[in-house]
């Protein structure tokens, strides 16, 4: 959602979460249950709940959508986060999280566990009829960045720089499988509302963070957006469990994962955006840099 429920993202590596779970004897019961629950995930319902008004109303600068776009734009405006290769971990059916990133990386990989989400991304990337309309988000990103770029140019650049949309399983030590179709290690990772949404407990959350960190070069950057103190969200017929995390638990997981936390911001979800599609309390945004030497 534009809040905690942006939890669009699922966990696994294949197109069939049930099959993926059955094929992995190391999956614990909690992770299997998460994978099975996501079989009922409905991308369009998720998008309506979180990216159409009221949460998708970007006219109020105090809204959650503008806040997330500002967080991303401000980090990229520093010039410190750039390179060639960026991986978006658990993209779900959304693209807004890459609108500011795409000017700084020429090779972008989007990923998701669910085939339905990868298909939804494909509709937008190919400009097919019926694709979700992200133009309001693209316009707002251009407004924030204030570089004189049109929203059409912004979207054209993002489409050109997304080179592949792949399955991922953040619960596997090699989340993208082997051999990887992505040039590794990446210079940066982006992940929005993924890890907490697919982890049955805090230990799984921390382990998933460790797994994706293996994809990132030492000195590389992670930009992480997620839900605070959320335990469930809706995506159509699916009611999906979330591991509730606090700001301090996020910080601790990043430090334990070998990161220097450059910035950690929080957004408290206002009452008018609490619409009954989840129980999210707030959103966090973390900018973290992978230590050159892992402790």
Curated annotation (Swiss-Prot):
Pathway: Catecholamine biosynthesis; (R)-adrenaline biosynthesis; (R)-adrenaline from (R)-noradrenaline: step 1/1
Residues engaged in binding octopamine: 230, 278
Family, similarity comment: Belongs to the class I-like SAM-binding methyltransferase superfamily. NNMT/PNMT/TEMT family.
Cited Pfam families: NNMT_PNMT_TEMT
SUPFAM superfamilies reported for this sequence: S-adenosyl-L-methionine-dependent methyltransferases
Enzyme nomenclature, EC number: 2.1.1.28
UniProt keyword terms in alphabetical order: Catecholamine biosynthesis, Methyltransferase, Repeat, S-adenosyl-L-methionine, Transferase
Free-text disruption phenotype from the record: In knockout (KO) mice, resting cardiovascular function, including blood pressure (BP), heart rate and cardiac output is the same as that in wild-type mice. Significant difference, however, is observed in the BP response to exercise. The relative diastolic wall thickness and the ratio of left ventricular posterior wall thickness (LVPW) to left ventricular internal dimension (LVID) are significantly increased in KO mice.
Keyword Transferase: yes
Job description of the protein: Catalyzes the transmethylation of nonepinephrine (noradrenaline) to form epinephrine (adrenaline), using S-adenosyl-L-methionine as the methyl donor. Other substrates include phenylethanolamine, octopamine and normetanephrine.
Gene3D superfamilies linked: Vaccinia Virus protein VP39
Domain of life per record: Eukaryota
Catalytic reaction(s) noted: phenylethanolamine + S-adenosyl-L-methionine = N-methylphenylethanolamine + S-adenosyl-L-homocysteine + H(+); (R)-noradrenaline + S-adenosyl-L-methionine = (R)-adrenaline + S-adenosyl-L-homocysteine + H(+); (R)-normetanephrine + S-adenosyl-L-methionine = (R)-metanephrine + S-adenosyl-L-homocysteine + H(+); (R)-octopamine + S-adenosyl-L-methionine = (R)-synephrine + S-adenosyl-L-homocysteine + H(+)
NCBIfam families for the chain: GntF_guanitoxin
2 X 7 AA repeats of G-S-D-[LP]-K-H-A: region residues: 4-20
Residue ranges, annotated region (Disordered): 1-26
Organism annotation: Mus musculus (Mouse)
Residue stretches of each Sequence repeat: 4-10, 14-20
GO MF, any single term: phenylethanolamine N-methyltransferase activity
Tissue/organ expression: Brain (pons and medulla oblongata), adrenal gland, retina and heart.
Keyword Manganese recorded: no
Residues that bind S-adenosyl-L-methionine: 46, 51, 90-91, 96, 112, 117, 169-170, 192
Stated name of the protein: Phenylethanolamine N-methyltransferase
One biological process term in Gene Ontology: epinephrine biosynthetic process
């Amino acid at each position: 959602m534009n809040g905690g429920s942006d939890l669009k993202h699922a966990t696994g590596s294949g197109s069939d979460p049930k099959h993926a779970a059955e094929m992995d004897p190391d999956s614990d019961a909690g992770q299997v249950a998460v994978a099975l629950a996501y079989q009922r995930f409905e991308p369009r319902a998720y998008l309506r709940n979180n990216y159409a008004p009221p949460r998708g109303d970007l006219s109020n600068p105090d809204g959650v959508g503008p806040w997330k776009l500002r967080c991303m734009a401000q980090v990229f405006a520093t010039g410190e986060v750039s390179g060639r290769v960026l991986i978006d971990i658990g993209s779900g059916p959304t693209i807004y999280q890459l609108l500011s990133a795409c000017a700084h990386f020429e090779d972008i990989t989007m990923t998701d566990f669910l085939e339905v989400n990868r298909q939804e991304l494909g509709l937008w990337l190919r400009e097919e009829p019926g694709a979700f309309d992200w133009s309001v988000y693209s316009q707002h990103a251009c407004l924030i960045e204030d570089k004189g770029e049109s929203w059409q140019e912004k979207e054209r650049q993002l489409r050109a720089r997304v080179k592949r949309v792949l399955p991922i399983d953040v619960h596997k030590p090699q989340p993208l499988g082997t051999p990887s179709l992505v040039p590794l290690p990446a210079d940066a990772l982006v992940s929005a509302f993924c890890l907490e949404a697919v982890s049955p407990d805090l230990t799984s959350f921390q382990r998933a963070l460790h797994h994706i960190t293996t994809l990132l070069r030492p000195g590389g950057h992670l930009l992480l957006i997620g839900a605070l103190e959320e335990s469930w969200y809706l995506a159509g017929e699916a009611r999906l469990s979330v591991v509730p995390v606090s700001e301090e638990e996020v910080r601790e997981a990043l430090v334990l994962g070998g990161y220097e936390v450059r910035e950690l911001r929080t957004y408290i979800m206002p009452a008018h955006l609490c619409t009954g599609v989840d129980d999210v309390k707030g959103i966090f945004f973390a900018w973290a840099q992978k230590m050159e030497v892992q402790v």
